[in-house]
UniProtKB/Swiss-Prot annotation:
Task of the protein: Peptide chain release factor 1 directs the termination of translation in response to the peptide chain termination codons UAG and UAA.
Superkingdom per UniProt: Bacteria
The species this protein was found in: Syntrophotalea carbinolica (strain DSM 2380 / NBRC 103641 / GraBd1) (Pelobacter carbinolicus)
Gene: prfA
InterPro entries xref list: PCRF, Pep_chain_release_fac_I, Pep_chain_release_fac_I_sf, Prokaryotic/Mito_RF, RF-1
Protein name, entry field: Peptide chain release factor 1
Gene3D superfamilies: 3.30.160.20, 3.30.70.1660, 6.10.140.1950
SUPFAM superfamilies listed in its UniProt record: Release factor
Length: 356
């Protein structure tokens, strides 16, 4: 079954290669770009499949040599076979992953929302730590981070911070970060040295494009008001802050970071569209979960997904039972140590669901 699919992919790859060299196609910019993207997606599958076929031919050749009259040739073939068979098995696993249904949001930018939860000032400080962690990870990936909305805490950190992270395949790397993040550490103000537990919630929403969400302007209520600082005092004499309410869903977004009302409105609309898209996706996922047990990347935000224990230098991801004693590096943005095992875990779940 899988090999029939792979043959179809290779046939389509050859067809697309031919089309990309057709002058008529080259002259149609939109069509040419679509085919270029498809060619890039197919090429990764085809490269592994062709390597799989080459290794399979080598295995067959070595098996034939086992019957050779020359004892040295037989011994050489026998010695090479285990390594070739192991390599072929690795390639087969890669192909299974490559043929999994693609998440249509993987290539998208994200809206990152971090909110302080239980724990008061400590939770707000941890929200700041999490934002720095994600910002440094983004910097390492060559992504751009743009703050959309900030609610500062007087003790430092954030009550809430919303940012846009844009770049190559951002959602694919950050989609498993949605959930409740718990921190255990001794606050600087704690004289007795007792460990306090605080929590923040993280939401990672794929950036909504106009084609994803159709919002009727008559469904929006837009309020303008004067921006205020951390202590509640007004910091702007003009009504530049914007609050947008989507009446049918009750989704409310406020933005006051920019001095221009127009810019605040544009930022608020981006967040609003992404939140509504997230609601639509959540409804769809709930429907899918009723049909199949495994729900990949559902990002259930009521779930405690990770604990950061500072006294022990430990970070534990509860979804996959992974514990790393490299907390300092993780907080500095070395998130790949968590992202890669999570991705592999959910890919394995998806493969098991396909084979069931």
């Amino acid at each position: 079954m899988i090999f029939n699919k792979l043959e179809e992919v290779e046939d389509r790859f050859r067809e697309v290669e031919g089309l990309l060299s057709d002058p008529q196609v080259v002259s149609q910019q939109k069509r040419f770009l679509e085919l270029t993207r498809e060619h890039a997606e197919l090429s990764s599958v085809v490269a592994v499949y062709r390597e799989y076929k080459r290794v399979s031919e080598d295995i067959e050749g070595n098996r034939e040599l086992l019957q050779d009259s020359d004892p040295e040739m037989r011994e050489m073939a026998k010695a090479e076979l285990p390594e070739l068979e192991a390599h072929r098995e690795e390639l087969a696993q890669q192909l299974k992953v490559l043929l999994l249904p693609k998440d249509p949001n993987d290539d998208k930018n994200v809206i990152l929302e971090i909110r302080a939860g239980t724990g008061g000032d400590e939770a707000a400080l941890f929200a700041g730590d999490l934002f720095r962690m994600y910002s440094r990870f983004a910097e390492g990936q060559g992504w751009k981070v743009e703050t959309m909305s900030v609610s500062d805490s007087e003790a430092g950190g954030f009550k809430e911070i919303i940012a846009m992270i844009s770049g190559n395949r951002v959602y694919s790397q950050l989609k498993y970060e949605s959930g409740t993040h718990r921190v255990q550490r001794v606050p600087e103000t704690e004289a007795q040295g007792r460990i306090h537990t605080s929590a923040c919630t993280v939401a990672v929403l794929p950036e909504a494009e106009d084609v994803d969400v159709d919002i009727d302007p008559t469904d929006l209520r837009i309020d303008v008001y004067r921006a205020s600082g951390a202590g509640g005092q007004h910091v702007n004499k003009t009504e530049s802050a914007v609050r947008i309410t989507h009446v049918p869903t009750g989704v409310v977004v406020s933005c006051q970071d920019e001095k221009s009302q127009h810019k605040n409105k544009a930022k608020a609309m981006k967040v609003l569209k992404s939140r509504i898209l997230d609601q639509v996706m959540a409804d769809q996922q709930a429907q899918m979960a009723a049909d199949r047990k495994s729900q990949v990347g559902s990002g259930d935000r009521s779930q405690r997904i990770r604990t950061y224990n500072f006294p022990q230098g430990r970070c534990t991801d509860h979804r996959i039972g992974l514990t790393l004693y490299r907390l300092e590096g993780i907080m500095q943005g070395n998130l790949s140590e968590l992202v890669e095992p999570l991705t592999l875990h959910y890919q394995s779940e998806a493969m098991a669901a396909q084979e069931a």
